[in-house]
Amino acid sequence: MSFTTCLIVMVGGALGTLARYLVSVAAMPISRFIPWGTILPINALGSFVIGFFGTLTLADGRYPVSENMRLFVMIGLCGGYTTFSSFSLQTLDLIRNDAWGRASVNVAASVILCIGAVALGHITADGFNTGAIRIAQTATEEDA
């Protein structure tokens, strides 16, 4: 692990953290009873991005990128942006305030939406990859 790699992850994490803060502030009005601002725009979007980018940028994907770019986006940016630790604390706060129903909704919605978002990101990028492979195969066949 080089200093450059650490720097790449650190910068991505800083940008992801700043984005998380800005989105959290903007989502405060809708987060009065259940922390929807954390669930939807942060954890679900971050999960979609990591699934989409991770699939689209594989070596055999439509847009392969360097390992450093994957580290920047997937570990740095998404790691700083998504907030599982915040989700856990918010859920514990709901439980400590005897809001078990709201805590249960928070857990279920977070898990279901985030796993669904990763799957949707993967499926969407896989469609891009498959389309790129078909286009490349058609072009190769036409050249032959």
UniProtKB/Swiss-Prot annotation:
It comes from the Bacteria. Keywords: Cell inner membrane, Cell membrane, Ion channel, Ion transport, Membrane, Metal-binding, Plasmid, Sodium, Transmembrane, Transmembrane helix, Transport. Pfam families: CRCB. Na(+) binds at residues 79, 82. One of its GO terms (biological process) is cellular detoxification of fluoride. InterPro entries: FluC. GO terms for molecular function: fluoride channel activity; metal ion binding. It is a multi-pass membrane protein. It catalyses: fluoride(in) = fluoride(out). It is found in: Cell inner membrane. Na(+) is not transported, but it plays an essential structural role and its presence is essential for fluoride channel function. The chain crosses the membrane at residues 7-27, 33-53, 71-91, 105-125. GO terms for cellular component: plasma membrane. HAMAP family: FluC (MF_00454). Belongs to the fluoride channel Fluc/FEX (TC 1.A.43) family. PANTHER family: FLUORIDE EXPORT PROTEIN 1-RELATED. Fluoride-specific ion channel. Important for reducing fluoride concentration in the cell, thus reducing its toxicity. NCBIfam families: crcB, PRK14206.1. This is Fluoride-specific ion channel FluC. It comes from Gluconobacter oxydans (strain 621H) (Gluconobacter suboxydans). The gene is fluC.
